[in-house]
Every structure is written in C-alpha cells, then in structure tokens.
C-alpha cells in the first residue's frame, strides 16, 4: 500500500505535495518522494524512511520549486526500502509514482533490457517508467494508452 498525490496550481508545489503526503503517511512509512516540474526540468527529491526524512533532506539540499508535481509515500512490495527504490521513478521526459502491483513487470523488464534499457531499482514502478519512455510518441495520451494495454495488475499511477 502506498500514498500518491499530484498537484497543478499557483502555489509552491513542493509544500503542497509534502503536506498532502503527510495526510497519507499511514499508507507507507518506508520512503517518501516528490517530483516537481521546475523551469521545464523534472526535479526529484526522495529518500528512505518517513516523510520527516524527506523534509530534512529538502531543507538541507534546497527544495524544488514549481507549480506541477507528484508525490509518493511507500510501503515496499517490490524491492527493499532504500533511496534507490523510493519513488518517483523516471527520466528527463516522464516521471511516475505508483500504488499497487504490476504482475507482469518481470517480462516487461526483460523485454526492455533486450531493447537496451538499464535499471537501477528493484521496483515494478521503474519498469512502467521505462515502458512509458519506450512507447513515447510525443502524444502523452497515445503513450499512456499503449502502456496501459501492456501492464497487468491492480494499480494506480501518477504520471508527469
């Protein structure tokens, strides 16, 4: 079980996301993270442990600033609790948060490795992020439709 949130608006996105995750923290204590679109670049802050660890990290490193973002609190299902397995996962084009289980992630991961993709985490979520990149056409809706046709399981995704 995980908690996922998204925000688009006029306020400082990082604060809104972290405050929203605080209300969902009971859904996951293993790690927390956010991704914020800052001046056209996706900035990710994430870490192992409770949401307070993320707050402290952003206080030390400087928080991302923007008006669009996604956030996640994690209860680990695939991969141990670690900074690397924390969400969000993604790349320069797409970043995601995920709640649930992708049942066929191993098969998708094997296919993507054969296509030249590499993985850093042990999560099923990273597999979906790479699949979004693989199918990316420039049209987000078309890309998401293709990915949803491939993945099996019970899940919710926040995609940015």
Model-derived features: where do they sit?
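Conserved short alpha-helical segments that host acidic/polar catalytic motifs at enzyme active sites
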Residues: 1-160
């Amino acid at each position: 079980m995980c908690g996922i949130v998204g925000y688009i608006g006029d306020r400082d996105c990082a604060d809104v996301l972290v405050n929203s995750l605080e209300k969902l923290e009971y859904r996951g204590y293993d790690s927390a993270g956010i991704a914020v679109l800052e001046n056209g670049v996706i900035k990710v802050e994430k870490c192992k442990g409770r949401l307070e660890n993320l707050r402290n990290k952003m206080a030390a490193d400087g928080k991302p600033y923007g008006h669009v973002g996604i956030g996640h609190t994690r209860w680990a299902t695939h991969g141990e609790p670690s900074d690397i397995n924390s969400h969000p996962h993604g790349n320069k084009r797409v970043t995601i948060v995920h709640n649930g289980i992708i049942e066929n992630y191993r098969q998708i991961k094997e296919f993507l490795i054969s296509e030249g993709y590499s993985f850093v985490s042990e999560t099923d979520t990273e597999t979906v992020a790479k699949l979004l990149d693989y199918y990316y056409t420039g049209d987000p809706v078309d890309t998401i439709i293709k990915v949803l046709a491939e993945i099996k399981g019970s899940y919710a995704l926040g995609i940015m």
